[in-house]
């Protein structure tokens, strides 16, 4: 049986007089006194079909029984709609199909929510439980189609650049990469476990050792971590690695790749992208993920804070803290009530309060006006390049707290005051991250333990490891990290040195990474790589509010699958086969 001659978006006045066959879902049903109208929908569009009782009573009776989301196959004659009855909102709005034959392919139960009315706000849990129905509402499938085209563009471009797509194992070894692993028990080796990959990191480096030269993969990765709007327990990344190159070789490739991906949505980007060191990003934006669509740059004002008799300023400076903030152009119109809201807001991030200074008609209005002379305030206005009717917002706190608080505050104010265009795309490379961070008094990797230090900083590994910069880089878009990568360590002695600084014993290294150190010992080319977060890119490209909206079957924020009711208990016999007890 041939189910269709045309899709539901293809018919026009050019087809009038033709007999056609269509298949699809009942989108809307209307009975207008002996005339039944049905909007028949498939993935591509909608066509109105019609049956008149006087012309075909039996068929009219059958169509009158049809309900929403039944699946139909119809045959009929394409006719022009009567004058004034056209629907300009439909591609097929100038025609209708007069049905001569109808077959019900599948019936539908009563729906848990409306498919035809896309404006109804449906609870997300209900949508995820009936994901297959949610897909029929249009947005999800449109985003999946966009994702498909983005993946095609990615594969085509990387193939042009000499990258080979290789699928790496999903069942691997548990290694310390930062987040918790998802573990898979082995039936054949009782008491032993595989780990699902947090990334193909070691495999792709070993591919470089093996001489592949350039690798890529659209990889599924797994991390058992607390979720938020832009995280999922399983996610996709465009994974890349290349030999005999450095960041100056990789950056142009990634920039052109991103340009091709955005071109799928008709978005033109300007390359090369801006660059900024980690230190600059922290100093001027308070974060290593700066949103550059607007100004509100942070400025250190410790030299002016010293001139205040304000104890909070002086105490923080004495304790090694900082005083910094930003200027909001025209912000003198912010009310006291709203400033109180901002004060409560920054307290969420550890700040003790918020200092505000308004430049109004050459005069000073401030909650710390009595603690400094007018001359000091005017010096600060000059330093911040503040004009009349501007406001300075300052925080005195330890550096990390001040940065975090001001980062969130500048984003909030920029959004409230509409300081940027939502359709604006500002990319920036963040480079020269610290190689190490400190956690509970111990060194840990800022990225991962396979990241190479900058060559000029290698002598500092023994003297001052926390000051060592890494040859690593993130690509940030509008405040989102969409890619992260680094030059890799290709010298086994240096790799062992890094493991030693991370307090990994030789026994632990041999157990967890022995195979990898062995691989590095057989002649390893200099290599580097990057991984682009496909889900995050799709979230930005499609304007989705969460990553869940760009994944076909996402998990909830509690890592649950509501449609399949997973995770779920397993049978006692399955536990026994795996040698496990609960």
Curated annotation (Swiss-Prot):
Chain sites annotated for binding ATP: 223-225, 232, 481, 533-536
Source species of the chain: Chlamydia muridarum (strain MoPn / Nigg)
Gene responsible for this protein: aspS
Keywords tagged on the record: Aminoacyl-tRNA synthetase, ATP-binding, Cytoplasm, Ligase, Nucleotide-binding, Protein biosynthesis
Predominant place of localization: cytoplasm
Family assignment from sequence similarity: Belongs to the class-II aminoacyl-tRNA synthetase family. Type 1 subfamily.
Full protein name: Aspartate--tRNA(Asp/Asn) ligase
Record localization: Cytoplasm
PROSITE patterns: AA_TRNA_LIGASE_II
Residues annotated as transmembrane: none
